[in-house]
């Protein structure tokens, strides 16, 4: 682990803060250009537009970081984000908001490249720990960002966008002057490697190498959209919670989630292996879903938050397993693909689970959790079956970082 690893964590923290900063004020900014009854539709489209661009372009940018190095792609992404936020800050028409989100989604590769830096600079046995820290950094940024954005929004709905632009400019300077390249692009002079980094064959290779792991990853991310989609609706309906109680619960979940990813995921993976960490995370999440389906008292939600947060150890461990099985010249492509899959669930999940919750609500508001639990049972069985094979035992395959 070197200074570039730590800088990758800082980049992720600041990137998440920038995303979180604008969320509280984006509806207010929209109100300057459109009628109130149209705000929800445009807000949803703007969020979906960013996610859709990430689905399309994150794999390509990840592959470019394999070909040209992590540093130039990071700098490109940070420039794109800075321009996006400045465009939003100075926006005087609706099309400027759409253009800004479009550009940010296209150039937003910081998450994939930061994960690639972790893969480049850490040993196989320590990778889950650092992927956990990466997830925790993003989570803390998403907690701090909306708080800062909420206060800054009291001054002007444009203020948080200036702050977000400043954060990205600062991060750009950090990468420019202190970040050392972690990808040896001289590896790409090998004919086979060079062809792969310049074509889409790398994705075919990844899908052939670990199809079940990618399916498990996508499915787990998709199920994770259930609480993200229905939490406010469910807690208001069953427990009569107001916005303050919902806010407390979400803040508590975010904080606990970061703690588990930072301090628990790596310890479990080191002591008992990545497979155990993945399974324990899925079991914790599925147990939380089972409790949420049946509890009738609001205070019982808070102990369940510990189980939900405990589920946060699964994906860093799974990401570690996949990274260990991936060659060094494919790490950027893998991390870009994972970002793409994650954002795809962010587009599909809210649409799918909002419809399911709405249609099942007249019968019973717990059905959404039972459906999620059923999917988790399938994922757990897949994980136990596939990850018992020797090649999935990442901790036993020490590869050079």
UniProtKB/Swiss-Prot annotation:
Changing residue 257 to E: No H(+) translocation. Residues 1-6, 62-71, 120-129, 179-211, 266-275, 323-332, 388-401 are cytoplasmic. One of its GO terms (molecular function) is antiporter activity. The chain crosses the membrane at residues 7-30, 43-61, 72-91, 99-119, 130-152, 159-178, 212-232, 244-265, 276-295, 299-322, 333-356, 366-387. GO terms for cellular component: plasma membrane. It comes from the Bacteria. One of its GO terms (biological process) is response to antibiotic. Changing residue 257 to D: No H(+) translocation. Pfam families: MFS_1. PROSITE patterns: MFS, SUGAR_TRANSPORT_1. Signal peptide: none annotated. NCBIfam families: tet_MFS_A_B_C_D, tet_MFS_B. This is Tetracycline resistance protein, class B. It comes from Escherichia coli. The gene is tetA.
């Amino acid at each position: 682990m070197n200074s570039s690893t730590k800088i990758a964590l800082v980049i992720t923290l600041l990137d998440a803060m920038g995303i979180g900063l604008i969320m509280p004020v984006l509806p207010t900014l929209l109100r300057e250009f459109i009628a109130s009854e149209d705000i929800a539709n445009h807000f949803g489209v703007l969020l979906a537009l960013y996610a859709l661009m990430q689905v399309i372009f994150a794999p390509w940018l990840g592959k470019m970081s394999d070909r040209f190095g992590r540093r130039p792609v990071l700098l490109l992404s940070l420039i794109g984000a800075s321009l996006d936020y400045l465009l939003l800050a100075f926006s005087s028409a609706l099309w400027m908001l759409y253009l800004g989100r479009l550009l940010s989604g296209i150039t937003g590769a910081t998450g994939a490249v930061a994960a690639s830096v972790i893969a480049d600079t850490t040993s196989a046995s320590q990778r889950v720990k650092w992927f956990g820290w990466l997830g925790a950094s993003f989570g803390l940024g998403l907690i701090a960002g909306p708080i800062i954005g909420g206060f800054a929004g009291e001054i002007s709905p444009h203020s948080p966008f200036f702050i977000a632009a400043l954060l990205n400019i600062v991060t750009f300077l950090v990468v420019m002057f202190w970040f050392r390249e972690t990808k040896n692009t001289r590896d790409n002079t090998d004919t086979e490697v060079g062809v792969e980094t310049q074509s889409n064959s790398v994705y075919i290779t990844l899908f052939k190498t670990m199809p079940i792991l990618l399916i498990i990853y996508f499915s787990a991310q998709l199920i994770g959209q259930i609480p993200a989609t229905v939490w406010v609706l469910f807690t208001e309906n069953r427990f009569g919670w107001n916005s303050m109680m919902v806010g407390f619960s979400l803040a508590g979940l975010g904080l606990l989630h970061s703690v588990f990813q930072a301090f628990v995921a790596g310890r479990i993976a080191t002591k008992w292996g990545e497979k155990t960490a993945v399974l324990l995370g899925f079991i914790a999440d599925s147990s939380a879903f089972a409790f949420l389906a049946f509890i009738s008292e609001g205070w019982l939600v808070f102990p369940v938050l510990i189980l939900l947060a405990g589920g946060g150890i699964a994906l860093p461990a799974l990401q570690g397993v996949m990274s260990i099985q991936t060659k060094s010249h494919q790490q950027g492509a893998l991390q870009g693909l994972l970002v793409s899959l994650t954002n795809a669930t962010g587009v599909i999940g809210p649409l799918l689970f909002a419809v399911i919750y709405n249609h099942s609500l007249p019968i019973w508001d717990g059905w959404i959790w039972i459906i999620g639990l059923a999917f988790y049972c399938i994922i757990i069985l897949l994980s136990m079956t596939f990850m018992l094979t020797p090649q999935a035992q990442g901790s036993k395959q020490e590869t050079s970082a």
